[in-house]
């Protein structure tokens, strides 16, 4: 009798569970609930580098947003073009063989075109893409080792080709023009680096890996030298924290990347995670990691934002359109901080030289 009652109880539990699941599915359909295709970033590990890849947002081919320039023919890009020459940035993008087609090619088709030089760093060489083969293994525990080898490769082959050296992931979107404005105030021969500054574990703080970080030429030299002299080691698997510790050991300053009114420019998540209040729960690690008090909502982000992380391939093109194409008619930019006097003089002199050429009839 007792065993029959126990069997009935188990049958009741199973039936209840199945009924609950069926009802949940029914309500989802009736209410038109959408499947969340955004990356799952609400993990407990602040150093988890890449979004959970569910395969839903992969695009088959690249898109060329610059193919139709009919609405940009009278656009004045003089300042941006001058900064491109004055503030030279080499970008290297952390990727892997499995991500060249899924992610890296969309970086290549969008923001990477504005780098003075761009390199895609993988564990294996790919001459067609192309990607540099660092001869490492793949996996999160290899990220710092890949980072060290990538910077060593850049130092050996491209040290004189740029003034600043940006590391980004293949799911990071970067606005290079805003980064050049930020860096224009600084001397690349000084030991300094910039990114989204976190505070735990390192006295001066360190830069979030996902939001990307940029080293001055002198900072790059010191970082590479640190491993020649054994002042730093490659034993850690936590890339951004380990690099931050090494920077502090080598007396490389953790710079303040906020804009002139104190708003953050480097962002470790996609825009909506910063802009929408309540998206990131207060128990989330992010709130305790920021070096400067974080702001939630529209005040979170500078109008001259530099980067966003966990950007899937679809959002990569959405950001490209929003940043470089969408404009409200009849508005001039409200927030346009001035350039350093040194840069302004150089631009003015360049324009004078160009005017002289025109007057003399030279092309």
Curated annotation (Swiss-Prot):
The catalysed reaction is: an N-acetyl-alpha-D-galactosaminyl derivative + UDP-alpha-D-galactose = a beta-D-galactosyl-(1->3)-N-acetyl-alpha-D-galactosaminyl derivative + UDP + H(+); a 3-O-[N-acetyl-alpha-D-galactosaminyl]-L-threonyl-[protein] + UDP-alpha-D-galactose = a 3-O-[beta-D-galactosyl-(1->3)-N-acetyl-alpha-D-galactosaminyl]-L-threonyl-[protein] + UDP + H(+); a 3-O-[N-acetyl-alpha-D-galactosaminyl]-L-seryl-[protein] + UDP-alpha-D-galactose = a 3-O-[beta-D-galactosyl-(1->3)-N-acetyl-alpha-D-galactosaminyl]-L-seryl-[protein] + UDP + H(+)
Top-rank taxon of the source lineage equals Eukaryota
Keyword S-adenosyl-L-methionine listed:
no
Residues recorded as bearing Phosphoserine in the entry: 235
Q: What is a single molecular function from GO for this protein? A: metal ion binding
Which parts of the sequence lie on the Lumenal side of the lipid bilayer? 30-363
* Pfam families documented for this protein: Fringe (PF02434)
Annotated keywords: Angiogenesis, Developmental protein, Differentiation, Disulfide bond, Glycosyltransferase, Manganese, Membrane, Metal-binding, Nucleotide-binding, Phosphoprotein, Signal-anchor, Transferase, Transmembrane, Transmembrane helix
Required cofactor(s): Mn(2+)
Q: Name one GO biological process term.
A: intestinal epithelial cell development
UniProt GO cellular component terms: Golgi membrane; membrane
Task: Name its pathway.
Answer: Protein modification; protein glycosylation
Q: Provide the transmembrane region boundaries.
A: 7-29
Q: Which family does it belong to?
A: Belongs to the glycosyltransferase 31 family. Beta3-Gal-T subfamily.
What is this protein called in UniProt?
Glycoprotein-N-acetylgalactosamine 3-beta-galactosyltransferase 1
- Species: Homo sapiens (Human)
Q: Which gene encodes it?
A: C1GALT1
């Amino acid at each position: 009798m007792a065993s029959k009652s126990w069997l009935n109880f188990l049958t009741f539990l199973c039936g209840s569970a199945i009924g609950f699941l069926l009802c949940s599915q029914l309500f989802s359909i009736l209410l038109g609930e959408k499947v969340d295709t955004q990356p799952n970033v609400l993990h407990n590990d602040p150093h988890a580098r890449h979004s959970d890849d569910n395969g839903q947002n992969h695009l088959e081919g690249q898109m060329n947003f610059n193919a139709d320039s009919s609405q940009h023919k009278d656009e004045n890009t003089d300042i941006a073009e001058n900064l491109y020459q004055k503030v030279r940035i080499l970008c290297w993008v952390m990727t892997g063989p499995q991500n060249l087609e899924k992610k890296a090619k969309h970086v290549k088709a969008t923001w990477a075109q504005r780098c003075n030089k761009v390199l895609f760093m993988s564990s294996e060489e790919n001459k067609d893409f192309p990607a540099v083969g660092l001869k490492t293994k793949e996996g999160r525990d290899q990220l710092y080792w890949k980072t060290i080898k990538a910077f060593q490769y850049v130092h050996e082959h491209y040290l004189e080709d740029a003034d600043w050296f940006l590391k980004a992931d293949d799911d990071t979107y970067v606005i290079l023009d805003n980064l050049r404005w930020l860096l224009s105030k600084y001397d690349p021969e000084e030991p300094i680096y910039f990114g989204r500054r976190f505070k735990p574990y390192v006295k001066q703080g360190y830069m979030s890996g996902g939001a990307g970080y940029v080293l001055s030429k002198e900072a790059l030299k010191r970082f590479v030298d640190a491993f020649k002299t054994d002042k730093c080691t490659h034993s850690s698997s936590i890339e951004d924290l380990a690099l931050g510790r090494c920077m502090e050991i080598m007396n490389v300053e953790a710079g303040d990347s906020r804009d002139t009114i104190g708003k953050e420019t480097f962002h470790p998540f996609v825009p909506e995670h910063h802009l929408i209040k309540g998206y990131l729960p207060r128990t989330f690690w992010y709130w305790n990691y920021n070096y400067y008090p974080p702001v939630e909502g529209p005040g979170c982000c500078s109008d001259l934002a530099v980067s966003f992380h966990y950007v899937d391939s679809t959002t990569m093109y959405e950001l490209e359109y929003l940043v470089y194409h969408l404009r409200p008619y009849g508005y001039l930019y409200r927030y346009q901080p001035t350039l350093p006097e040194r840069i302004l003089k150089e631009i003015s002199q360049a324009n004078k030289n160009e005017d002289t050429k025109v007057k003399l009839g030279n092309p």
